[in-house]
Amino acid sequence: MVTATGIAPGSEMTAQMEQVEERNVSGVLHIASIFASHMVLQRNKPIAVFGALAADCAGMEVVAEIHDFDGSLIAQEHAYSSQNVVNGFSQWRVMLPAQPEGGPYTLRIVAGNDAIEFDDVLIGEVWLAGGQSNMELELRNSEHADQALEDCADPLLRFYNVPKTGVINRNAENTSSWQESSPENSGVMSSVAYYFARKLRSELDSDLPVGIVDCYIGGTSISCWMSEDALNSSDAGRDYLTRYQRAIAGKTQQQFELETSEWESQVDEWNANVAAAREADSDIAQEKLNEQFGACPWPPPLTPTSQWRPCGPFHAMLERIMPYSLAGFLWYQGEEDEQYCGFYRELLGMMIGEWRALWSESLPFLIVQLPQWIDKKVDEGDGDPMLWPVLREAQWDAAQSIDNVFAICTMDCGEYNNI
């Protein structure tokens, strides 16, 4: 079913591609894809384990257990799946008792005659890193990347990349995994989140595992990470929904596909030109590239399945991993909302409240403020230099007015004309 903001929550309309083997399925038992061998679970608070059962098993008991390396039982709890069946599944959630840091352990989930086990499970600190391209910048593309990757091997630092999508993509979820930090793996990790995790590893106990859940998409507005109910609760949120609905009104599926295909071709051509230019001159400036090839084609066309539409990633990414037990959130986003910066303070507060409600606790929320940066069009007098200061003020105000929210100033970290 398609709603005003795209695919309806829980809809069976999912990303279409060649099917791959289901990773977290055994008979009637389904477990959320964020659970995998090598994962890090949150210490010192109840551990949420969740998934679904086939419809004819509604009300069945589900048991979750943590076992030590020698097979001895460390923790066990059970729950019953919901009697309500949605899209052929009955949801369940088991809350294991809080555990101190440690591992490696085995997490075992049983429903009737079906069971799934995950090995090499650690318990430590787990943070979710969210936002747009600021957070998405991969370690391999960051400054001093070669040295960082050479030094990144750490079996107690692990990460999980939530598949980037605007519509539930089970194939991508089935191929996703928790990975140890290593030169082979960590290049695709968020650079900001990696250095944050490294700091935790160095400042906290030396044997404390740290896990990062990467959940971001470049170019996303804050509205992409909120629900329809949240956006509809304020004039600011409704404004985003109205603009999106106007953008897709009257268009057919064929038009959506054509617009997307044309845009993807333009981006592919631009990327190829830029790659060739950088191959010829590794020091070529972005300004020179823009003069030769124009700016990267942006924004992408909006469609009912777009990952840049309001609420899309909220349903297809964030809801797919909640309420995986966390220590807190790390948020780095804002520039996509510069034209509507007057709304940002209200929406940021609403988003923080909604995320905390999903996790049922007032988790710490660390907001990375936008850095110093001046767009060339502003430098040339064709833009408003005060948009980003408004966003920074909104981020700072949220930290001053909402409990357990903190702003991280990066004014001295940006470059004059390159964010």
For each predicted feature, which ranges?
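Cell-envelope and extracellular/periplasmic
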Residues: 2-419
